[in-house]
């Protein structure tokens, strides 16, 4: 069933508010802060419909709604506008990597650290030998989704054992250059609040994946073009 324009605008408003606050979004909030031009009752009815269609879900602890992975994917594919890196940021990032003139392994580690800083997330990368590079673990500790020690422990433990990266790689199809994954797709309960944006890089004898781990509500409009730029930059700098 295709969504109406009103439903699309409502879904966009709910998701962008959820990305901003990490809290379930109620009809009153949308009515006050979004210029949808409809009554609170209409907003509530449409939220019920979007829930029935699988785009939203209601938490046990709140009357508000949060997006499902289906809702987030629809937002990314159909509603979201990417926010490209500024030219100043692109130049600064490129200069920092080029000026180091490092061997590939050090450059990949350096790239991962800069990506973590740029996205305020946990950045990961692999090389052709399967070695894993990670940076920004402290970043996720500031996010409400990772206040749950069991979730954080699961992510860091699986990363340490390479299980998490193996699970992500297994989800990437051969023709895909960039993929958005949600924790529930990996079938691991403690990863359900997580989101992943990963891309491939390949040049000469070096290939692997590069990406970030964060909450499922991460700001994909910023993260996707950033991860894509880092992959393209890395491919151009591979020695």
Predicted regions mapped to residue ranges:
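Residue-level marker of regulatory loop/turn positions in helix-turn-helix DNA-binding domains and
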Residues: 3, 23, 144
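N-terminal helix-turn-helix
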Residues: 13-20, 24-78
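Intrinsically disordered, acidic Ser/Thr/Pro-rich low-complexity regulatory segments
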Residues: 73, 80-239
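Conserved RecA-like P-loop NTPase ATPase core
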Residues: 10, 68, 212
């Amino acid at each position: 069933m295709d969504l109406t324009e009103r439903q699309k605008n409502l879904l966009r408003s709910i998701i962008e508010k959820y990305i901003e606050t990490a809290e379930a979004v109620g009809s009153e909030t949308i009515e006050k802060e979004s210029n949808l031009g409809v009554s609170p009752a209409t907003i509530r009815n449409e939220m019920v419909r979007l829930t029935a269609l699988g785009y939203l879900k209601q938490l046990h602890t709140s009357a508000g709604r949060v997006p499902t992975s289906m809702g987030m994917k629809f937002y990314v594919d159909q509603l979201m506008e990417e926010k490209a890196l500024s030219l100043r940021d692109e130049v600064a990032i490129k200069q920092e990597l080029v000026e180091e003139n490092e061997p590939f392994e050090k450059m990949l580690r350096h790239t991962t650290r800069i990506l973590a800083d740029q996205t305020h997330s946990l950045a990961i990368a692999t090389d052709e030998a399967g070695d894993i590079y990670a940076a920004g673990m402290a970043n996720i500790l500031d996010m409400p989704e990772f206040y749950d020690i069991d979730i954080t422990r699961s992510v860091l433990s699986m990363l340490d054992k390479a299980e998490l990266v193996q699970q992500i790689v297994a989800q990437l199809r051969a023709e895909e250059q960039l993929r958005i994954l949600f924790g529930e797709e990996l079938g691991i309960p403690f990863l359900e609040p997580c989101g992943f944006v990963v891309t491939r890089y390949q040049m000469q004898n070096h290939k692997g994946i590069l990406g970030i781990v964060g909450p499922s509500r991460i700001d994909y409009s910023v993260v996707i073009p950033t991860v894509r730029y880092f992959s393209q930059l890395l491919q151009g700098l591979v020695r």
